Each structure stands twice: as structure tokens, then as C-alpha cells.
From Swiss-Prot:
Lineage of the organism: Eukaryota, Metazoa, Chordata, Craniata, Vertebrata
Compositionally biased spans, kind Basic and acidic residues: 153-169
PROSITE patterns cross-referenced by the UniProt entry: ZF_CXXC (PS51058), ZF_PHD_1 (PS01359), ZF_PHD_2 (PS50016)
Protein name per its UniProtKB record: F-box/LRR-repeat protein 19
UniProt-annotated binding residues for Zn(2+) 2: 50, 53, 56, 72
PANTHER family hit by this protein: PHD/F-BOX CONTAINING PROTEIN (PTHR23123)
Transcription found in the keyword field: no
Residue intervals of every CXXC-type zinc finger in the record: 32-78
């Protein structure tokens, strides 16, 4: 149940993994430790997979090997919740915030998980004296417990923190959300109002050393938020803080008096920013000047004055400009210089009406990756290393499926339970399996692993029939590819264009493809899939197929390789083409004669636009089909008349001619053609059906 804050190598809160359970964390309910679950309400949880990220391309449903076992990048939950089995480590009970009404009572009875020690407790069960805790408002039931805060323990990457998370669109960005600070000390009186006069005298902000600041953690841009009080066994006060900084008690909520939440006292804060400098050389900022416009403020106590000095020191440290800020930030700063001159300039420079240069020597970086800054006039030159650079973005993967490594060779013998091998070799078993049907082969695949591998042999699956299935699942497509059939029937199925393209690119030995009854949207995948071994193509009764669609299918691919002089069409090697029920015209037949010259069987039945001129095109002296046609089906073509029957005598190899259901053809004319058909007479087993024995 424990949770770790995402580090530098993780993408967001969805990557929160369960840490290994230590002996110190054992307690009531500590054995049921699980990772956080989806909230099922955010934008990432309710959307579907994108199909483009490297996790989606690895999934089996998208044609990948399925080895990563990760969800889509765009479906990573942005606010994962604790599992329903989570219980308090101290009392062993689950969250009971639904049993009370008040906000304070709800907080005391809700489960909170620490991002440092991973312990899940009720805040009301903690018996801590004066302690502080920071609540993360981004992730539900997440905080830094008072115990870890009191001991000074920090997470692995406090600079990035749990607030850095990936947005709903899948891009990683800096979250501008804020957390809650929990303290049990009595509240301080409200601070004096913000002065509109010049800032207190002191060294310029850009001449004072300080750690580099990321522009996405500029907490000064957030509006001040009032405190919230929580009443329980002891009085607690929650103060809104932004990102990685907490508001100093007694400081101005509207001002930029922010300091890192792990700083314990001013000496530690200044010494961490000035390594190697003795305390007597630390330059302390001067007290603020009184403003003529502001109201009179009573003299603060010594402790309050010390806090004010500490606040102003941290303010100056935080305002050291970041050299990695973009030019757009500098432009926006220059545009708003008229309104923020008294806030962003040092007192001396504000009076002179000028701003320090951006490229001054106080901001330049040395070649060693260290920044040199003079804290004051005549002071020593200080330097410290820059902060760690953000991790580089992962390289964009190529948009193709990564195929799994080649499988190990299949065993030649069948191992038995006794340890010996079966006397029959693999070749003998395959001869036995060839007499079984698809259903019996599937039963044999469940017997043992060896038989399962043997039954995938493509010689056992010459033809696969998936017709009349509403949807094709990824396991079905993977099974087809593993068996490598020579004939595949997908008629009247809901196969999509993406699925068909995925199949055809992996079935290079496919000889027969049946797509009758499918939509043109899916059949259009034939225009981009190479089928060198295809001999039969069935496109009967496909919806919305006209001359333009057939032209797209018949024309040669536009991406011919350089140096290739011959432009072959996609159906150059097809011997049997079935186009029944399509709206074909004579223009489509001309394309067919040009780009499918090896047709021996052609089905044009129930094509409403086929008539006598179409038969003249098929049997013309320039037609390549005149010498190759063996089977011709023109049943249901109502525009055919008796005048086209003598044209069929031009086809010497014609063995079957189907003219059934042609209304304008007389049975007598068909009988005369059957009696005088070259090179021998036809026989008529049915009316208007002419057959010739080979």
C-alpha cells in the first residue's frame, strides 16, 4: 500500500509503485500492501488507448509482442487513490471520514500516506507534540508526515517533488498545484499590509548569491491564500503553500517570503547557500524603510524582527534570476516593468530609474559549470555548482511494430512423462495431424506443449475460415499469422482497415483472399499491402465501390522504387477475380484488361452496367483476356441481348459461360451458341448455363 513519490526517471504519479515491506513497517494490516489504484474519474482514466505511444505499440491488441505489460501513456491516472484494503498502521482501521460531518473531523479520520516513510496513518492517531507536516493537494491522501518532517528526512528528489506530474494530454509538465502545511503551534497575528513604497535597502537581488531557481516553481506568481483551521484533539492550522516552498509563519502572505520547506533555521539556510564562507562574513540584509504611504506599524518584537530579516534574506536569495530562462520570459518582464519596477529592482537602482543588464558579469556562467556572484561590494567571489539538469527527453521511437525474437527450433521428438521420447518422430505426427480438421487440431493443441507447437505448422492450415464474425479480436489475428494459411476467408466480417493491413503485411504467402461483403473502408487496405503470391481475390458485394475505388485498387503503386522501369499493377498475378454485385462500367473494364492481363476466371454477375459493349471489350482482338479466359460468369446482367452471343466464339479456351437470369437473352439463342461453340459444342445442364468438357 505504500507509495513513493516519482523520481527523475518516472513519468508521473501513475508510476507509484509499492516499496518492499520492511520489518519496521509491519503492523495491523501491513501484509496487504498494494499499489495505488485508478481514480476512474480523471480525464486519463476515462479515455481509450492512443495506439501511438511505445506502450500501445507493444500491446498484443495493436500487434506488438506484449512484453512491457504497461498501460497507455495517456491513460496513466493523474490522481491515484489508496486501495480499498488500506488501513491505519497504528489503529488498524480503515478511513472513517464518511462518518463525520465537519471538515476538521474528516481530516483527522482520513488515511494519509507519507511520501517519505510510506506509512499510512490517521492524522488523529499521531501523538506528536510540536510538529509540522506538508499535505500534497495534488495526490489524494498524500502528505509528508510530521514525524519525517521533525526528523528532517526528505524524499529522494525534493526538487521535483510529488507536484511534478504529467498533464492529462500525456505531456510532462510542472504542476502549479499547492500543498497544505500542518502545524500545531498557535497562530500568529496577521502581518502588516503590503507597502507600496520602495523595498528595503540592501544589496541588489541579482548581486546576492542564491541557488538557481526553476521558472516553473516561481511561487511568487500565486495569489495569497488564507489559512484554514482544523479542530480536533489539538488545534491545528493549515496554511496554503505552493509547490516545493512553504510560507514562513509571520511573513507577508502576499509577498515573496518563501523558503524551502526543509530549512530549519536561518543559519542552516544561509550556510547551505554559502559553502566555505565563515558566519562572520555573512552579510545580513538591512531592515526595511518606512513608507510614507503605508500606515503606521508598531515596532515588532526581537523575535519578529529576526523573522523579518530572515524572510527578506530568503526573498533576495529566491530572486536571483535563472540564466536558463527563455527570451520570452525576459520580454514579458520588460513589458511589465512599468508596474513591477518597485518590486523587482533594488532600492538604489529603482531611484536611478534603471535596471541591471541581463548579461552582466554577475550572471555569467564559468566554463566549469559554476556560477560566480559577488554578494556585495568588496566581498569575496563565491561560486557553487549549478542544479542538476533535467533528464533528457526519451528518443522518439519509430512507428512500427517491434517483432519478437525468433523462436527456438521445434523438438523432433515427443518427450514422455517417464523421461524417454516417443518412438514416432515429428514428421510422422504431422502426417497424422494432416487428416484432422481445425476443431480436432485445436483439441490436440491442449494436450501438451510439444503438440501445441507442432500443430502451428502451416501445412496443417492450408485454409482458414473466419467468415461471418462480427469482430476479430487480436488473439484471432495473431493465431492467423502464426499458422500462415494459403487461403483466408474474411467474408462478411467486421474487419477494420488497420487489422487487414496488419494481416496482409505478415501473410506474404497468401494465395487466396475472400473479402466479400466487407466495407470499402477496410478493403482499401489492399492498396498499400504487397501481395506477390495472390492468385484469387474475391470482392463480391462490397459496399460503395465505383470506378474511382476500383481505379485505386488496380493502378500500380505510386511509390515505385528508383531504377524500376516496369510499373506492375497490384493484381498483375491474379488469375481469378470475383466482382459480382459491383457498380462497374466500361471504364473499369478497360483498366481491368490493362492491369490484370492473366485472368482466367472472371465473375461479373449482377453488375447492372455490364452490357453488349462490355462483352465486345472482353473479346476484342486487343484484349489479353481473349486468349486466357476459361470461366466467365455474367449471370444477372440484364443489359445483355442476343446480339452479344456470337462474340463468345472468339474465346477458344472458354469452358464455362454462365448467362442465367439474363432477362433479354432467349433460350433458343443460347442453344444455338451451345451447338456451334468453338472448338467444340457446349452442353447445357441448366438453361443458359454452358459447359464444355476439358
Amino acid at each position: 500500500m505504500g507509495m513513493k513519490v516519482p523520481g527523475k526517471g518516472e513519468s508521473g504519479p501513475s508510476a507509484l509503485l509499492t516499496p518492499p515491506m520492511s520489518s519496521s513497517s509491519r503492523g495491523p494490516g501491513a501484509g496487504a500492501r498494494r499499489r495505488r489504484t485508478r481514480c476512474r474519474r480523471c480525464r486519463a482514466c476515462v479515455r481509450t488507448e492512443c495506439g501511438d505511444c511505445h506502450f500501445c505499440r507493444d500491446m498484443k491488441k495493436f500487434g506488438g509482442p506484449g512484453r512491457m505489460k504497461q498501460s497507455c501513456l495517456l491513460r496513466q491516472c493523474t490522481a491515484p487513490v489508496l486501495p480499498h484494503t488500506a488501513v491505519c498502521l497504528l489503529c488498524g482501521e480503515a478511513g472513517k471520514e464518511d462518518t463525520v460531518e465537519g471538515e476538521e473531523e474528516k481530516f483527522g479520520l482520513s488515511l494519509m500516506e507519507c511520501t517519505i516513510c510510506n506509512e499510512i496513518v490517521h492524522p488523529g492517531c499521531l501523538k506528536m507534540g510540536k510538529a509540522e507536516g506538508v499535505i500534497n493537494a495534488e495526490i489524494p491522501n498524500c502528505w509528508e508526515c510530521p514525524r519525517c518532517t521533525q526528523e528532517g528526512r526528505t524524499s529522494k528528489d525534493s526538487g521535483e517533488g510529488p507536484g511534478r506530474r504529467r498533464a492529462d494530454n500525456g505531456e510532462e509538465g510542472a504542476s502549479l498545484g499547492s500543498g497544505w502545511k500542518l502545524t500545531e503551534e498557535p497562530p500568529l497575528p496577521p502581518p502588516p499590509p503590503r507597502r507600496k513604497g520602495p523595498l528595503p535597502a540592501g544589496p541588489p537581488p541579482e548581486d546576492v548569491p542564491g541557488p538557481p531557481k526553476r521558472k516553473e516553481r516561481e511561487a511568487g506568481n500565486e495569489p495569497p491564500t488564507p489559512r484554514k483551521k482544523v479542530k480536533g484533539g489539538r488545534e491545528r492550522h493549515l496554511k496554503k503553500v505552493g509547490g516545493d516552498a512553504c510560507l514562513l509563519r509571520g511573513s507577508d502572505p502576499g509577498g515573496p517570503g518563501l523558503l524551502p520547506p526543509r530549512v530549519l533555521n536561518p543559519s542552516q539556510a544561509f550556510s547551505s547557500c554559502h559553502p566555505g564562507l565563515p558566519p562572520e562574513n555573512w552579510e545580513k540584509p538591512k531592515p526595511p524603510l518606512a513608507s510614507a504611504e503605508g500606515p503606521a506599524v508598531p515596532s515588532p518584537s526581537p523575535q519578529r524582527e529576526k523573522l523579518e530579516r530572515f524572510k527578506r534574506m530568503c526573498q533576495l536569495l529566491e530572486r536571483v534570476p535563472d540564466t536558463s530562462s527563455s527570451s520570452s520570459d525576459s520580454d514579458s518582464d520588460s513589458d511589465s516593468s512599468g508596474t513591477s519596477l518597485s518590486e523587482d529592482e533594488a532600492p538604489g537602482e529603482a531611484r536611478n530609474g534603471r535596471r541591471p543588464a541581463r548579461g552582466s558579469s554577475g550572471e555569467k556562467e564559468n566554463r566549469g559549470g559554476r556560477r560566480a556572484v559577488r554578494p556585495g561590494s568588496g566581498g569575496p567571489l563565491l561560486s557553487w555548482p549549478l542544479g542538476p539538469a533535467p533528464p533528457p527527453r526519451p528518443p522518439q521511437l519509430e512507428r512500427h511494430v517491434v517483432r519478437p525474437p525468433p523462436r527456438s527450433p521445434e523438438p523432433d521428438t515427443l518427450p514422455l512423462a517417464a523421461g524417454s521420447d516417443h518412438p514416432l518422430p515429428r514428421a510422422a505426427w504431422l502426417r497424422v495431424f494432416q487428416h484432422l480438421g481445425p476443431r480436432e487440431l485445436c483439441i490436440c493443441m491442449r494436450v501438451c506443449r510439444t503438440w501445441s507447437r507442432w500443430c502451428y505448422d502451416k501445412r496443417l492450415w492450408p485454409r482458414m475460415d473466419l467468415s461471418r464474425r462480427k469482430s476479430l479480436t487480436p488473439p484471432m489475428l495473431s493465431g492467423v499469422v502464426r499458422r500462415q494459411p494459403r487461403a483466408l476467408d474474411l467474408s462478411w466480417t467486421g474487419v477494420s482497415k488497420k487489422q487487414l493491413m496488419w494481416l496482409l503485411n505478415r501473410l506474404q504467402g497468401l494465395q487466396e483472399l475472400v473479402l466479400s461483403g466487407c466495407s470499402w473502408l477496410s478493403v482499401s487496405a489492399l492498396g498499400s499491402a504487397p501481395l506477390p503470391a495472390l492468385r484469387l481475390l474475391d470482392l463480391r458485394w462490397i459496399e460503395d465501390v465505383k470506378d474511382s475505388q476500383l481505379r485505386e485498387l488496380l493502378l500500380p503503386p505510386p511509390d515505385t522504387k528508383p531504377g524500376q522501369t516496369e510499373s506492375r499493377g497490384r493484381l498483375q498475378g491474379v488469375a481469378e477475380l470475383r466482382l459480382a454485385g459491383l457498380e462497374l462500367t466500361d471504364a473499369s473494364l478497360r483498366l481491368l484488361l490493362r492491369h490484370a492481363p492473366q485472368l482466367s476466371a472472371l465473375d461479373l454477375s449482377h453488375c447492372a452496367h455490364v452490357g453488349d459493349p462490355s462483352v465486345h471489350l472482353l473479346t476484342a482482338p486487343t484484349s489479353p483476356l481473349r486468349e486466357t479466359l476459361v470461366h466467365l460468369n455474367l449471370a444477372g446482367c440484364h443489359r445483355l441481348t442476343d446480339h452479344c452471343l456470337p462474340l463468345f466464339r472468339r474465346c477458344p479456351r472458354l469452358r464455362r459461360l454462365d448467362l442465367r437470369s439474363c432477362r433479354q437473352l432467349s433460350p433458343e439463342a443460347c442453344a444455338r451458341l451451345a451447338a456451334a461453340g468453338p472448338p467444340g459444342p457446349f452442353r447445357c445442364p441448366e438453361e443458359k448455363l454452358l459447359l464444355k468438357d476439358s
